[in-house]
Swiss-Prot record:
Keywords: Cobalamin, Cobalt, Disulfide bond, DNA replication, Oxidoreductase, Redox-active center. Its cofactor is adenosylcob(III)alamin. CDD domains: RNR_II_monomer. Its EC number is 1.17.4.2. The gene is rtpR. This is Probable adenosylcobalamin-dependent ribonucleoside-triphosphate reductase.
Length: 650
């Protein structure tokens, strides 16, 4: 049991939260997103409503801090904690700021109290020098919901095992059993370990409920496929059919595919390579590597530019970016030397999380929180929300994970990422000068609050405290543009796929919401929702240079970690040579960069489709009222991590 001392809101505070009006930002789309992704089943079999989730999260985060204080015999003022918790919960209820999706799903659950904090974290990364250990750790983190970054550092040392006399390993019906089986199989190649065949008989059948973690069991089939694939990849490597880079990335992509195809968790990865590695540069070229099309999409791929000496690689990199938007670029010198631009903050990190907002050491995790700056009425309002978001992020890492190698690094760095979303909306609404002022003073506020909380807890202050995350699903709840990005359109249709057997789909259909058969997945329906962004300009009206200037402004004024970005460009205006000059000009001032060519591709049931104002207004009047109190027994689908504009899949 990781938590023994619990914090409970009094009945009058809970009643206040249950009876206080609130409004999701995009109306019915936001409501459906909440119930699809974050509404857990309560003990009585009904689904959480938004106030229930707010209460669970509030009691969970305050339980972590209370538990830490009492376990270490530190001061704890219950009366003051209750006062602050009430304000904290009310601001969250109104969607002024939010925890990350992992926090909405896992905070305050029995799984967290019994198993520790790993399921609360967004960001993870691992060095692959020890291939078997790295693969085990990565699968472990993917299965609890973190996005994982990995490099290609493995030495390549391996030998074929003796398959004639295998040992039998009976896989336990648990996450631990799955990840151990993967480690044992890889070790039979890399560590001269015994070769294993696996007994899957203990694994519960597909469709069984996962009562503690939440969700539905996938059965043994995804793991069986993964074991066969791992064996094939390592055999192909030793038979010289693929090289070391392919071996590492193929292994990790297939681990991610197992997690996704099993519907265990929505996984996301980033593969991190060297700019001179030609195999790595062409991993997304499915004409060159056609077999990778099945699983190559699992990871974003980025190359590490260590310093100015590596800038000669940029021409080759941008020639690839010009066609498909990959690879991304990480600037190692800036990651390790600076906090915000120009501020010296030594950092050992050499890896990144999948969306590029947090630089990480191997086996490190980082948790986030998010303020919707465009929803603030003034600077004082923004400063108050910083207190809540910083409290949340600074408290999660007081609770250990189940991994000792991870706890060691978290205890040293205490790295957090307080993020802002709706940045583009706020610039249009308040003006750039005002937002720069808010962010500059806001950063100092985050630091002040974090230092106070660290002192109270008797721990080091956080190495770094701010970032800008991409905010796909969470920004939909609040109704803002995601992260630093401009919306794809001011008026749009947002489509969501929901499984036909889902009780959520049945409720929507029974309520009168129109739907279509999914032409790509016979087991799903597609629902379309009209939305309006509070921004007069869409991304099509914002040039690449203006986007880059917003990125560098955020790295200078706010983010001492990194700024997740997908910078879109018109390929008819900017060729590879133009992109090379842009990257060389801006990269010395930033830490991560993703460039994506705009494509006018139109296809049926697009996730996001621009519409006219008149169509928006017509469709809004056709939306039904859904009686959410009738929803029960729906198993939420948890969030999809790959949520930047370049890779959102619903």
């Amino acid at each position: 049991m990781y938590v023994e001392h619990f914090f409970k809101l009094p009945s009058q505070t809970k009643e206040l939260l249950q009876n206080t009006p609130y409004r999701f930002g995009f109306g019915l789309l936001s409501e459906v997103t909440f119930y699809r992704s974050y509404s857990r089943l309560k003990e009585d079999g009904t689904n959480e409503h938004w106030p229930d989730t707010v209460i669970r999260v509030t009691e969970g985060i305050f339980s972590i801090r209370k538990n830490h204080a009492l376990n270490y015999h530190l001061p704890w003022d219950e009366e003051q904690a209750q006062i602050f918790a009430k304000e904290f919960a009310l601001s969250m209820l109104q969607l002024r700021w939010l925890p990350p999706g992992r926090g909405l799903w896992m905070m305050g659950t029995r799984y967290m109290y019994e198993r520790g904090s790993a399921g609360l974290y967004n960001c993870a990364a691992v060095d692959t020098s020890n291939l078997a250990h790295a693969a085990e750790w990565a699968m472990d983190m993917l299965m609890v919901g973190a996005g994982v970054g990995f490099n290609t550092a493995w030495s390549g040392k391996a030998t074929k095992p003796d398959k004639k006399h295998p040992k039998i390993y009976v896989i336990d019906d648990s996450k631990e059993g799955w990840v151990k089986s993967v480690r044992l199989l890889i070790q039979s190649y890399t560590d001269n370990g015994p070769f294993y065949r696996f007994d899957y008989s203990k694994i519960r059948p597909a469709g069984s409920p996962l009562k503690t973690f939440g969700g539905i069991a996938p059965g043994p089939e995804p793991l069986k496929r993964l074991h066969k694939k791992i064996e094939q990849i390592l055999d192909d490597y030793l038979d010289k059919k693929i090289d070391k880079t392919r071996c590492v990335v193929d292994l990790f992509n297939n681990i991610g595919l197992c997690v996704v195809s099993g519907n265990i968790r929505r996984s996301a990865e980033i593969a991190i390579g060297r700019p001179g590695d030609k195999t790595f540069l062409h991993l997304k070229d499915y004409e060159k590597f056609p077999e990778r099309k099945e699983y190559g999409w699992i990871s974003n791929n980025s190359v590490v530019i260590e310093n100015l000496d590596d800038f000669h690689y940029i021409d080759a990199i941008t020639s690839l970016i010009a066609s498909n938007g990959e690879p991304g670029v990480l600037h190692l010198e800036n990651m390790q030397k600076y906090g915000r631009f120009g501020e010296i903050v030594p950092d050992r990190a050499w890896l990144s999380n999948p969306c590029g907002e947090i630089a990480l050491e191997s086996y490190e995790l980082c948790n986030l929180s998010e303020i919707f700056i465009s929803k603030c009425s003034n600077e004082e309002d923004f400063q108050k929300l910083i207190e809540y978001a910083t409290f949340y992020a600074s408290t999660v890492n007081l609770l250990p994970t189940h991994r000792p190698e991870t706890n060691e690094i978290i205890a040293r760095n205490r790295r957090i990422g307080v993020s802002v979303s709706g940045v583009a909306d706020a610039i249009e609404k308040f003006g750039l000068e005002t937002i720069i002022k808010w962010l500059r003073k806001g950063y100092e506020k985050v630091r002040t609050v974090n230092e106070r909380l660290a002192k109270e807890a008797g721990i080091p202050v956080s190495l770094k405290v701010t970032c800008v995350k991409p905010s796909g699903t969470i920004s939909i709840l609040a109704g803002t543009s995601p992260g630093m990005h401009y919306p794809l359109a001011t008026y749009a249709l947002r489509r969501i796929r929901i499984g036909k057997t889902s009780k959520l789909a049945k409720l929507l259909i029974d309520s009168g919401l129109s739907f279509e058969e999914d032409i790509y997945d016979k087991n799903s329906y597609v629902f379309a929702f009209p939305i309006h962004y509070d921004n007069p300009r869409s991304i099509k009206e914002v040039d690449i240079y203006e986007q880059m200037l917003v990125l560098t402004m955020l790295q200078r004024e706010w983010a001492d970690n990194m700024v997740s970005n997908t910078i879109q460009f018109d390929p008819t205006r900017y060729d590879a040579k133009d992109l090379s000059q842009i990257v060389k000009h801006f990269l010395p001032m930033i830490k991560s960069l993703t460039l994506l060519p705009e494509k006018e591709t139109i296809y049926p049931q697009m996730p996001f489709e621009s519409i006219k104002k008149e169509e928006f207004e017509k469709r809004v009047t056709q939306l039904p009222k859904v009686e959410w109190n009738t929803l029960s027994g729906h198993h939420a689908d948890s969030e999809r991590f790959c949520s930047t504009q370049s890779c959102q899949i619903d």
